[in-house]
Amino acid sequence: MSLPTLPEATDAGTSEPPKTQSRAPRIRSWAAGVYGQAAANALLLGVLINSGNRGLLSGLPGGYSAGTGDHYVLSSMGLHWADPTRYAGDWFLEAAPQPHWFFDTLTYLGSSLGILDLVYVLFWCFGLAAFGLAVAFLSRKWAPSMPWMFGAATTVLASLSPWMVVGTGSSMLALAIPAVVSANLVFLFIAAALTGRSRWMLAAAVLTAVVHVQQGAVVAVLLAALIVVHVVRHRVLPKATSAALAATAAIVAAGLTARPVAANTGDFVDICNELIAYHCAAQLWGTSTVLYSLATIGLALFTVMYEPSGNRPVWGAVVGLPMIGLSLGLMANVLSVPFFGELAQGLNVYRLGALVMPFAIMGLLLPLFRLGNKHLLAVLPLLLFTWEYLLSDSWAPVIPASAAFAAAYLAVVLIPVVVRSRRPERAVMTTRLSASALILLFLGTAVGTGSLTFRSLNTTYIPNAEVREWGEAVEKAVPPGESLLAPPLASYIRAATYRGVIADCKNIPYGGVPWAEWQERLGDLGGRDQCLDRNPQAYNGQSSEQLDRIAEKYDIRYMVVEQGQSDRIPELRELGWSTVLEPVNTIQNVVLHKTG
């Protein structure tokens, strides 16, 4: 397929342009084509995510960050490979290694070469590029008269959307982690399948399996569905797709064999119900969360209206199948259907939520770019889904529910429907103006709520300088191989010091013996309920004698006493503990050591 090109500049009277200028039209052609649009989408998305403040709601910095959040769990193994003194003897690292071998390798390479900050931000940018390319592919098929406007609207709305989608983290999370990058790769896989770009589709499939084993398994199922569609329609087995399926399945099988995601399905269901209900226990969700999830899926299913009838079987294989599977699993879980409800949890059907968001956004844009008087029956259910997904406070605090915003939104998206029905010759111009107004409405609202703060990109691993400085001091004071007695809620301690801990509320095994051991360890440290209610008193309320006995049980010789607990230091000294590190900065933590 040839890409659309810009008109060449009018000859200014010279007989032949110099050869040094011959590349200019090609560069302009590339910039105006699908790959130029993809780059623009990716850049816009990166700027908006880095300017976003959703992270502040969950204890993360604003914008992109590294060495925070899920990096507390996912970076440890690669850092240990690069420097065996880091996390040496850490119980969690030895008992429950994470399944992300590729991310471990990236971390190892980045840390070994002293460029971990750069490696992580490039990994994040790789995900942005995948998203940008997917949007560019689809915009040229679904909105061929104005692909750039469709792409910009999709990108802006996606960047402001909620970070939790049907129980799983969105691809808009401002972190360089496998879940984020793989979600964007799956989006690219689906977009390439829908637009007939087979090479990109097959490459995205294999890359997804490399980056994230669970999402690789999802892509393997979608590849199998595409093969079935192809065989039914053409009576021949697609060799390239079959080879990609074999490669993807092999990578997934190898990854799961080397590092099983969940050692015991029953244990994983218990973990869902007791510790991470927001992620995979829909029977415990509130009604509003369930309705929001169903509306998200419903909007994604509406994207079938963009597809010509001849390509809808392909859409059914890569969009319809996972969306229907997710909705069935969700409802089986919500209704606690015997066997099937727990099966949905055990298989972690909620991983499919990562596929939903970009298609839900494009479903929102249907009235703006496609619907007319032939589709009036579809407008009402679409608006009902839109109301639940967008206008019922689900996007708060970025986009708060308000009558003014709802009225402005409905006017912007419905005016093109009316014009397209009555004055089709003005439809393109009206759509352009309305799409521009929609983008300004969302950006203006986000700025007005303080949800966008334009900032420079901070790629530093552990961006908080004081936490980083304190962690470096502890790393020097506590010998390699030693672990720390520390509050379970203070997950930053393990991450910043590169020393193991007895257990914390962030590093939780997915089942088996490690899960039982984690429960015992948390029980000794004040109980696992503190991980749910975020109550530090469960640990801090224990006596100095109790803490001393815990240290003895787990052969721990170093203890972190956080600010606010310094009154217990004299008692601990009487029990044989001595200070090895005084407060370093405003983080008024003290590190104690016990000999013998």
Over which residues does each language-model region extend?
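Membrane-interface junctions at the ends of membrane-embedded or membrane-associated helices
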Residues: 18-31, 193-200, 228-240, 361-380, ...
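Active-site lumenal/periplasmic loops and adjacent helix-entry segments of GT-C-fold
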Residues: 35-159, 163-184, 210-215
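Transmembrane catalytic cores of multi-pass membrane glycosyltransferases
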Residues: 50-71, 82-100, 210-221, 225-365, ...
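Aromatic-anchored segments of alpha-helical transmembrane domains
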Residues: 155-163, 209-214, 249-259, 322-334, ...
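Transmembrane alpha-helical segments
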Residues: 158-163, 382-420, 431-461
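Membrane-interface transmembrane helices that cradle and orient dolichyl/undecaprenyl
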Residues: 180-200
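Short periplasmic/luminal acceptor-recognition loop of GT-C membrane glycosyltransferases, typified by
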Residues: 449-454, 459-537, 544-568
